[in-house]
Amino acid sequence: MRIFRCPRCRAEDISADAHPTRVLDNGVERPVFVCRACYRAAELEFRIASQTADLGYVPLGIRDGLRLLRDFYRARLADDEGDDPRVRSALAEVERRLAIDAI
């Protein structure tokens, strides 16, 4: 089983517990996945970078974040030589939440 580390702190395994956020890379918004402990700080860094670059900060929508997570977990399952039950469980939870329609 491959381990995917948080790109911010490099300490936590985010294989089955990732949190979507974004970074500003030369003026281009790029999605990244961080651990639970780094999420707020990473989102604050993105907000500050957006405001500094005069791009305007728009929070990541819940459904957009869930779609990013779904793609992340699907890629983990496709890359993984073994079938990790934690990743499969996380993917099932994300797909369940995506299936719920907005009221």
Q: Locations of the language-model features?
A:
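Hydrophobic beta-strand residues in large extracellular and virion-surface proteins
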Residues: 6-9, 33-38, 94
